[in-house]
Swiss-Prot record:
This is Elongation factor Tu. It catalyses: GTP + H2O = GDP + phosphate + H(+). GTP hydrolase that promotes the GTP-dependent binding of aminoacyl-tRNA to the A-site of ribosomes during protein biosynthesis. It is found in: Cytoplasm. The keyword ATP-binding does not apply. It comes from Brucella canis (strain ATCC 23365 / NCTC 10854 / RM-666). Residues 55-59 are annotated as: G2.
Amino acid sequence: MAKSKFERTKPHVNIGTIGHVDHGKTSLTAAITKFFGEFKAYDQIDAAPEERARGITISTAHVEYETANRHYAHVDCPGHADYVKNMITGAAQMDGAILVVSAADGPMPQTREHILLARQVGVPAIVVFLNKCDQVDDAELLELVELEVRELLSKYEFPGDEIPIIKGSALAALEDSSKELGEDAIRNLMDAVDSYIPTPERPIDQPFLMPIEDVFSISGRGTVVTGRVERGIVKVGEEVEIVGIKATTKTTVTGVEMFRKLLDQGQAGDNIGALIRGVGREDVERGQVLCKPGSVKPHTKFKAEAYILTKDEGGRHTPFFTNYRPQFYFRTTDVTGVVTLPAGTEMVMPGDNVAMDVTLIVPIAMEEKLRFAIREGGRTVGAGIVSSIIE
């Protein structure tokens, strides 16, 4: 069969395998490529290259494949620490996840931790693959494991009763030892992923937002703010808000320029200069955002999930405690904040991931799932994500 060229006509979805070490995440990834992509063997996926995201080195393997309905980019990480870092930094975005649980072992500590992380970082949907079912002869035992997985998902506010759970064996699929537990299960799994994991809204369809990187004044024209449009579309003549650091102000975009050409609009992905009416050069600064009125609010207090770099990763050499005051780098600027650790957490060691409360000294345009770096004097010591806003 001739290799078809990559068509951009199908919706694109980013997913990943999560779950406990040795439960079969990488074997499952290989098995999916066998039936839906260009086959990648276990060792090709397992030898994941290192990447850097927000100053943190992470090993992730990327494969792609497609079903009749969608094109998928799939990430698989070799080690548990890579999952933690990947999910917190958003190095590889996940619109949904396949949770792999060994039927022979049931849910294990990392199963729980990955579900919790998925909740904290806002992974929208999870589908479960109950792997190694060829090692379990007892149907009642399988039902017990399934029940345990559903209870665990519900505990972390996923709809445990509705989530599709597919029983199979990645190894059987790779070795063709059982069609039912192998190929059929993999095809059932991808049907479930197709139907249960929602297609993400494209950035261009979301409300307009552009982080401000720079401000210029052009004599006779007014003030220009530049940056890369993160999402949505801005049209000349539209009203926008400037949010963060200072009190929110409204203004009108009177011009949009890209590569020195005047445009009638800027859209997600474009690096633009926006000419804004009635705003002085000193009224607007890097670190604020330009956005659709009412779409984003400034906040100072939030709950976050963060990963703290190890000494070897260039992070701190010592632990920190409640009242730690680093800088939080949101989008384009650093803001000092005070950390409050949860009850029962005495201190945080380099290499830990932790839930914490943060109070910033000035408000920043913020919403759930916004990512940030934790820095000390310009050096990255951690990465985090806003899990919920307090005020």
